[in-house]
């Protein structure tokens, strides 16, 4: 993410000009933007003139710069788009003011965002800026007969490929093994990841490593091996829990979330220093007992938009109070397993400085 300009405007709002540079950046924006914000950018809009209406031609598409009063935001990771919908607040044609329009924001397209920024939202932008310099990490998990490739993103982990083959003893099965390792090697080479974690149970991953580095010697210095008891999604979770990603990526959102949710559930299991659900967490905040506040991005956005079910709770005040008391706040991605765990706990939890009872 590039932040190109930033200044205060009327009403205490702040306008930031930025350029999303990756799918991760678009995902960050999806959880920063909310109804009532103003988003401005270049777009094309179909304009229907009187003669067009008579002929029912649908009008001509015109390029214009528009400002949208945001009503809805949708992140479409499979089409690499962020859709920002709302009414036109400002543009070069007065006859279009107040009409509905959707900005399709893509990577490397400059836009302006004007809003009342919350501290965690600014932190999220700064995180996206810093992440630009972090390496791309692929996690390959392999055992006899199957291999999987996942890519670590800031919004979660995406599975990029899954391969199977008949392996075992015998010449035919040896051929299947070579084909599996060859397919895995080809896929990893095409990805051009900055770092690769090769994981799995037993000695199969060592055989896979030998095959990969024989075919693609340049990959050897990018590969780190990690022992896990499983492959696929479970194997990836083990890799993250063990901090292997942090060894090659100085800071990763997912590893931090995995560590925090594990700490929370451990404290819950031992009847220790933990709170979950809005009622318990709100009580802990009132006592100044929150060391780490965990909150789900979806829940935070719903509550800020007034569409949630936390009665008489100002979520911005809650977050601000924790920070003023010296606690940390982590906004979890709903796209990954730790976020799913947090959702099952009501979308909010806290690791405490001390027990409340």
Curated annotation (Swiss-Prot):
<dbReference type="InterPro" id="IPR038069">
    <property type="entry name" value="Pelota/DOM34_N"/>
</dbReference>
<dbReference type="GO" id="GO:0046872">
    <property type="term" value="F:metal ion binding"/>
</dbReference>
<dbReference type="Pfam" id="PF03465">
    <property type="entry name" value="eRF1_3"/>
</dbReference>
<keyword id="KW-0255">Endonuclease</keyword>
<dbReference type="GO" id="GO:0032790">
    <property type="term" value="P:ribosome disassembly"/>
</dbReference>
<dbReference type="GO" id="GO:0070481">
    <property type="term" value="P:nuclear-transcribed mRNA catabolic process, non-stop decay"/>
</dbReference>
<keyword id="KW-0378">Hydrolase</keyword>
<dbReference type="GO" id="GO:0005737">
    <property type="term" value="C:cytoplasm"/>
</dbReference>
<dbReference type="InterPro" id="IPR005142">
    <property type="entry name" value="eRF1_3"/>
</dbReference>
<dbReference type="GO" id="GO:0070651">
    <property type="term" value="P:nonfunctional rRNA decay"/>
</dbReference>
<dbReference type="InterPro" id="IPR005141">
    <property type="entry name" value="eRF1_2"/>
</dbReference>
<dbReference type="Pfam" id="PF03463">
    <property type="entry name" value="eRF1_1"/>
</dbReference>
<keyword id="KW-0963">Cytoplasm</keyword>
<dbReference type="GO" id="GO:0070966">
    <property type="term" value="P:nuclear-transcribed mRNA catabolic process, no-go decay"/>
</dbReference>
<comment type="function">
    <text>May function in recognizing stalled ribosomes, interact with stem-loop structures in stalled mRNA molecules, and effect endonucleolytic cleavage of the mRNA. May play a role in the release non-functional ribosomes and degradation of damaged mRNAs. Has endoribonuclease activity.</text>
</comment>
<keyword id="KW-0479">Metal-binding</keyword>
<dbReference type="InterPro" id="IPR029064">
    <property type="entry name" value="Ribosomal_eL30-like_sf"/>
</dbReference>
<protein>
    <recommendedName>
        <fullName>Protein pelota homolog</fullName>
        <ecNumber>3.1.-.-</ecNumber>
    </recommendedName>
</protein>
<comment type="similarity">
    <text>Belongs to the eukaryotic release factor 1 family. Pelota subfamily.</text>
</comment>
<comment type="subunit">
    <text>Monomer.</text>
</comment>
<dbReference type="InterPro" id="IPR023521">
    <property type="entry name" value="Pelota_arc"/>
</dbReference>
<dbReference type="InterPro" id="IPR005140">
    <property type="entry name" value="eRF1_1_Pelota"/>
</dbReference>
<dbReference type="InterPro" id="IPR042226">
    <property type="entry name" value="eFR1_2_sf"/>
</dbReference>
<dbReference type="InterPro" id="IPR004405">
    <property type="entry name" value="Transl-rel_pelota"/>
</dbReference>
<dbReference type="GO" id="GO:0004519">
    <property type="term" value="F:endonuclease activity"/>
</dbReference>
<dbReference type="GO" id="GO:0071025">
    <property type="term" value="P:RNA surveillance"/>
</dbReference>
<keyword id="KW-0540">Nuclease</keyword>
<dbReference type="Pfam" id="PF03464">
    <property type="entry name" value="eRF1_2"/>
</dbReference>
């Amino acid at each position: 993410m590039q932040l190109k300009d930033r200044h205060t405007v009327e009403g205490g709002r702040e306008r930031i000009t930025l350029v999303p540079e990756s799918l991760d950046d678009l995902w960050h924006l999806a959880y920063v933007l909310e109804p009532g914000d103003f988003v401005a950018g270049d777009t094309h809009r179909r304009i229907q003139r009187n003669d067009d209406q008579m002929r029912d031609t649908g009008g001509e598409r015109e390029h214009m710069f528009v400002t949208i009063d945001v009503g809805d935001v949708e992140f479409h990771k499979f089409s690499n788009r962020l859709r920002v919908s709302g009414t036109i607040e400002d543009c070069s044609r007065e006859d279009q003011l107040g009409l509905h329009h959707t900005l399709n924001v893509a990577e490397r397209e400059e836009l302006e965002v004007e809003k009342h920024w919350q501290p965690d939202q600014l932190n999220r932008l700064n995180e996206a800026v810093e992440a630009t310099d972090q390496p791309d990490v692929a996690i390959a998990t392999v055992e006899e007969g199957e291999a999987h490739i996942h890519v670590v993103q800031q919004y979660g982990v995406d599975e990029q490929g899954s391969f199977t083959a008949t392996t075992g003893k015998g010449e035919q099965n040896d051929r299947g093994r070579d084909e599996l390792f060859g397919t895995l090697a080809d896929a990893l080479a095409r990805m051009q990841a900055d770092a690769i974690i090769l994981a799995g149970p037993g000695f199969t991953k060592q055989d896979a490593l030998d095959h990969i580095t024989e075919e693609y010697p340049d990959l050897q210095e990018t590969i780190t091996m990690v022992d896990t008891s499983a492959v696929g999604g479970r194997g990836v979770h083990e890799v993250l829990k063990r901090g292997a990603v942090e060894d090659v990526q100085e800071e990763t959102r997912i590893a931090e979330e995995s560590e925090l949710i594990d700490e929370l559930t451990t404290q819950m299991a031992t009847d220790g220093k933990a709170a979950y659900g809005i009622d318990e967490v709100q009580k802990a905040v009132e006592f100044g007992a929150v060391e780490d506040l965990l909150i789900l991005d979806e829940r935070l956005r719903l509550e800020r938009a007034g569409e949630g079910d936390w009665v008489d709770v100002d979520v911005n005040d809650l977050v601000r109070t924790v920070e003023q008391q010296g606690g940390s706040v982590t906004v979890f991605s709903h796209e990954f397993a730790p976020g799913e765990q947090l959702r099952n706990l009501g979308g909010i939890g806290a690791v405490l400085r001390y027990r409340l009872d």
